[in-house]
Amino acid sequence: MGFFGERKLEQHQLNRDFKETKMADDGVRLVKPGMKYEGAQGVTYDAGVSRNTVGAEKVCMNILPMPPGVKSKPHIHRGIETIAYMLEGECTLFHGEQLENQTLIKQGEQIFIPENVPHAPYNLSDKKCVWVVVHSSGDDQDELVRTTELDYILENFGG
């Protein structure tokens, strides 16, 4: 079986196992809500379009709900760009070589994070926020590198 046949077989496996992803003969796929996963960043995502769900290789999109007080572990995406849209609420993004910059992203705003920039979202508000996160890779965990040397910054933030 050729390359496309193999992808189709993998996709049918996803359909049978998760009943979340639908595939037409032309390769157009629908991802329904319900699948979740925890990333190396220490936060739980609602799985969306990715290599694992639809076979995407160059782009992925996931939903990141963050209850009040939740923070990501500092990290970079080596060679991968990130765009994030704040669907609901607001959140502070710590970014820079030492997480020295803080940007408050509010509902309806978008932010671009260039490749290799250390960053970590931290919901300092008293309400849940929801991000739509897009990466220029088939999976948001591709080339993700934890910057553990920066963990202390968020652990000690605010006293």
Predicted ranges, named:
Residues 49, 62-78:
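Conserved short histidine dyad/triad with adjacent acidic residue
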Residues 73-75, 93-94, 102, 113, ...:
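Short beta-strand His + acidic residue motifs that chelate non-heme Fe in jelly-roll/DSBH
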Residues 106-107, 115-141:
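Ligand-binding loop in jelly-roll beta-barrel domains
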